[in-house]
């Protein structure tokens, strides 16, 4: 898309065509951010957001076996796990030593780093300064002077809402659109997914995961058909590493309580996150019955103590 004219209810496409609408759903996703560093245009310096980019990455690792991943967030670490299975040498570079520490806390951050190290991933704490090479990338140099050889680099350095074509609607500082509980931006425009900042427990929230976008889509569809069903659903997504699926319920920008029940190293645990006595998020592995019950209870705004009881009651049944 080239430009949205919300006053005239028109969309101008890149090929020059114009579309008119009565109601519009914006689900444009996000655009990977590329650090503005020397060598960023070298062949082999890749991002991952689309199926086409995934196909390029898979095809490239068939003959290039020294991968450096810049960033240790979900996409970066999921790729690390997937490509270690193919015997690719993987080095992860990040200024933040522990993967997912911001989302899951320090203890689970240490666990994920340890698990990836056990599978052969190398971690380097630092920031990239430049990518070296003639036509193709051959190394990454860091700000502290370290040099890491690489035949392929994945930039897992975050994304930005794909809203550059929007000029006549108010955008937030991060480029997203603010929506209400029905995903409405204005009288005839709705937005979902990566570009939508939505209310969650009274707090403006934006979550970058396709599963949450699916939840948003159902809510927006009802509202666009004049059958609004405000979004009270608990955000839910998962991340998978070395055959283990880790489920995340809710959303915790901060918490003042955390309890891990079970053992992450044994791939069976529940981590509860509480704020002011309320349950705000859950991370779990191989506790599907427990997470199913907690997902329902979180929608009813149950407390942290109630969640502890639920985990205890369901633990024996799942052992």
State where each predicted segment sits.
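Mid-to-C-terminal Rossmann-like scaffold of FAD/NAD(P)H-dependent oxidoreductases
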Residues: 195-290
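FAD-site-proximal beta/loop scaffold in flavoenzymes
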Residues: 41-64, 135-141, 147-215, 219
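A Rossmann-like FAD-binding core segment of flavoenzymes
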Residues: 2-4, 8-13, 19, 86-180
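Glycine-rich dinucleotide-binding loop and its adjacent helix/turn
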Residues: 28-86, 123
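Short hydrophobic core segments
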Residues: 19-31, 148-158, 217, 277
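A short, polar/charged loop-to-alpha-helix boundary motif
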Residues: 288-307
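Cysteine/selenocysteine-centered motifs that mediate thiol-based redox chemistry or coordinate metal-sulfur cofactors
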Residues: 57, 237, 304-319
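Residues at the starts of beta-strands that form the adenosine-phosphate
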Residues: 66, 88-91, 188
């Amino acid at each position: 898309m080239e430009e949205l004219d919300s006053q005239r209810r028109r969309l101008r496409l890149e090929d020059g065509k114009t579309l008119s609408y009565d109601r519009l759903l914006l689900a444009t996703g996000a655009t990977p951010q590329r650090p503005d560093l020397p060598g960023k245009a070298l062949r082999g310096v890749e991002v991952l957001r689309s199926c086409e980019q995934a196909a390029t990455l898979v095809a490239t690792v068939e003959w290039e076996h020294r991968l450096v991943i810049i960033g240790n967030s979900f996409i970066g670490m999921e790729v690390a796990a997937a490509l270690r299975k193919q015997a690719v040498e993987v080095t992860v570079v990040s200024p933040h030593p522990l993967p997912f520490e911001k989302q899951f806390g320090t203890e689970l951050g240490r666990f994920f780093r340890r698990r990836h190290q056990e599978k052969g991933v190398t971690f380097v704490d630092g920031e990239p300064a430049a990518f070296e090479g003639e036509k193709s990338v051959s190394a990454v140099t860091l700000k502290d002077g370290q040099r890491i050889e690489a035949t392929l680099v994945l930039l897992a350095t975050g994304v930005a809402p794909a809203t550059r074509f929007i000029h006549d609607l108010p955008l937030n500082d991060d480029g997203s659109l603010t929506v209400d509980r029905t995903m409405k931006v204005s009288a005839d425009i709705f937005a979902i997914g990566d570009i939508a900042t939505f209310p969650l427990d009274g707090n403006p929230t934006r979550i970058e995961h396709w599963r949450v976008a699916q939840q948003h889509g159902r809510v927006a569809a009802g509202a666009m058909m004049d059958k609004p069903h405000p979004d009270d659903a608990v955000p839910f997504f998962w991340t998978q590493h070395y055959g283990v699926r880790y489920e995340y319920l809710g959303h915790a920008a901060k918490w003042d309580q955390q309890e891990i029940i079970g053992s992450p190293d044994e791939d069976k645990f529940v981590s509860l996150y509480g704020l002011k006595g309320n349950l705000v998020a859950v991370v779990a592995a191989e506790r599907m019955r427990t997470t199913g019950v907690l997902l329902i209870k979180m929608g009813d705004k149950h407390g942290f103590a109630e969640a502890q009881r639920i985990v205890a009651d369901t633990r024996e049944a799942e052992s």
